[in-house]
Design a protein with these regions (language model features):
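Membrane-embedded helix-loop-helix hairpins and adjacent transmembrane boundary segments
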Residues: 1-511
């Protein structure tokens, strides 16, 4: 067992915080009068709270884990991810790219836009199904990341961690099922404040403990110039940087959880302000955890630590599960009792914040865009809320099972980017062409969605299943190469099929 400072006092702090979040869910349940309040908080989200909840849901434990893992694996070169995310978000905020037209249309989900724009209910159902499947797979390893964090920072064994994580997701289900988007927004705000303070204090203590010059020299000793320049790093390169910019646009303008907040905004002006100010948060949510990951790298390197983070030659471990554990183990050894509990509470609360947002998002997509359109009659608000709550429970059960057996095989961030690409490569083509090109048709949209599914070949286990691993390795084809290629083909397919099979006049809504 790895050494940690985690004590009984820290457990009390964490427990008290988690109980408080459940009380919030019970309290806001009285404000839920219909599906609009449950899914998009009655479209009453103002600028300041919108910024906090947008950053709060994205600044989760999973974000901290995969960002810290990238800092540990790539050094300061990993900072390009946050920089690309910040630039992409501010561009979306200034231009209103995609999100402003969606808010004007008054849609609650992206598949709902498919039907309004192209006049095809079947397209909405098909698109909603792909979105939900990709989204659920995308968050499939969130529980594993949470389990690794809890075991690393507290020192408890793996079997006990499984029960702790199961209890946590049950708490998430309770207040999300009761309060919907209103409880999500309120808890996101609280967790945003707690986690932000906790991470900043951690950075200060880490620099005081290690020293800035030691950090720079340590990264140089481990990675040389590759630890500072992403364009020459073997694991990164120019194509990966371009992929990160594209992911930055997707994260804020196409990914359903962010779009839900744009749709919940009070007005178009609020949407733009949310994105402009959130751009700093989208950047910092990567930079701070990456910096902590770099601190962990140098800390364990200077200690002369070998197992489990380094091999006998001083090389960083290539086991993704091991490198992901570096940050929580580092926190457990760095922070004093009490402060460690506060930071752990903030991190675990952030884990819950991400889960409540994503669970509600994918359950609502299945309800609004798959099951409800399949009905011969329109479901009542009461029926839709009941179905959404049922789906929340079923998705949570799947996540527990998936997180226990899926072999990671690559950095968590790369897994999330590729699994999300199953949806967003096609969706980006449909949104961009559909919103800004009048001739975009339903046939083109179908082709983009179908082509986008091929992004699944960026996942290692899929390559192994189809015996393609040797081909990908021999040709040095990585997940981001697959994602960029599929995105280009999806846009091309959208254009070709739209020109070849145009929509009939009058079967779509004007943008």
């Amino acid at each position: 067992m790895l050494e940690t400072n985690f004590s009984a006092l820290d457990w009390v702090i964490v427990g008290a915080y988690l109980v408080g979040t459940v009380i919030i869910g019970l309290w806001v349940n009285r404000y839920i009068k219909g599906m609009g309040e449950f899914l998009v908080a009655g479209r009453s989200l103002k600028t300041r709270l919108g910024i906090a909840t947008m950053i709060g849901s994205e600044l989760g434990l999973v974000t901290a884990m995969f960002a810290a893992q990238k800092g540990f694996s790539d050094g300061f070169a990993a900072f390009h991810i946050g920089l690309m995310a910040g630039i992409a978000t501010i561009i979306v905020g200034l231009t209103g790219f995609i999100v402003v037209p969606l808010r004007r249309m008054g849609v609650m989900t992206i598949p709902e836009y498919y039907e309004k724009r192209f006049g095809s209910r079947n397209l909405r159902i098909f698109g909603g199904f792909i979105l939900a499947v990709a989204g659920i797979l995308n968050m499939g390893l969130f529980l594993k990341a949470g389990a690794i964090f809890v075991s690393g920072i507290t020192g408890i064994d793996g079997e006990a961690v499984k029960w702790v994580m199961t209890a946590m997701i049950i708490l998430v289900l309770i207040y999300t099922c009761l309060g919907g988007m209103i409880s999500v927004i309120i808890t996101d705000y609280v967790q945003f404040v707690v986690l932000s303070i906790g991470l900043l204090v951690t950075c200060v203590i880490a620099v005081q403990k290690i020293g800035w010059s030691t950090l720079v020299k340590g990264v140089d000793a481990i990675y040389s110039d590759q630890g500072f320049n992403p364009f020459i790093a073997e694991s990164i390169g120019g194509s990966y940087v371009a992929w990160m910019f594209f992911i930055g646009v997707i994260s804020c303008a196409v990914w359903q959880t962010a779009v839900m907040r744009a749709c919940a905004a009070e007005s178009v002006e609020v949407v733009k302000k949310m994105y402009i100010w959130s751009s700093l948060g989208f950047m910092i949510r990567f930079l701070i955890p990456q910096f902590i990951g770099i601190c962990a790298l140098v800390y364990f390197f200077d200690m002369g630590s070998t197992q489990p983070f380094f091999d006998g030659q001083g090389q960083v471990s290539n086991d993704s599960n091991v490198t992901m554990k570096a940050m929580p183990v580092f926190l457990g050894q760095l922070l004093p009792v009490g402060l460690l509990g506060i930071v752990a509470a903030g991190m675990i609360a952030a884990f819950m914040s991400t889960h409540d947002t994503y669970l509600l998002c994918w359950a609502s997509v299945l309800t609004e865009d798959v099951f409800n359109p399949l009905k011969s009659y329109k479901m009542s608000d009461k029926q839709r809320i009941l179905l959404t709550r049922t789906l929340l429970i079923l998705i949570a059960a799947f996540l527990v099972m998936w997180g226990l057996w899926y072999p990671l095989g690559q950095d968590l961030w790369d897994y999330m980017a590729v699994s999300g690409a199953i949806y967003f490569t096609g969706a980006f083509a449909i949104l961009m062409m559909g919103l800004y090109w009048e001739k975009a048709s339903a046939a083109g949209a179908y082709s983009a969605l179908i082509i986008g599914i091929f992004a699944v070949f960026g996942l290692r286990p899929v390559q192994e299943f189809f015996s393609l691993e040797e081909f990908f390795n021999k040709n040095e084809i990585l997940g981001h190469h697959v994602g960029l290629t599929v995105s280009c083909f999806a846009i091309g397919g959208m254009i070709i099929m739209s020109v070849s099979f145009p929509n009939k006049e009058g079967n779509s809504e004007k943008i």
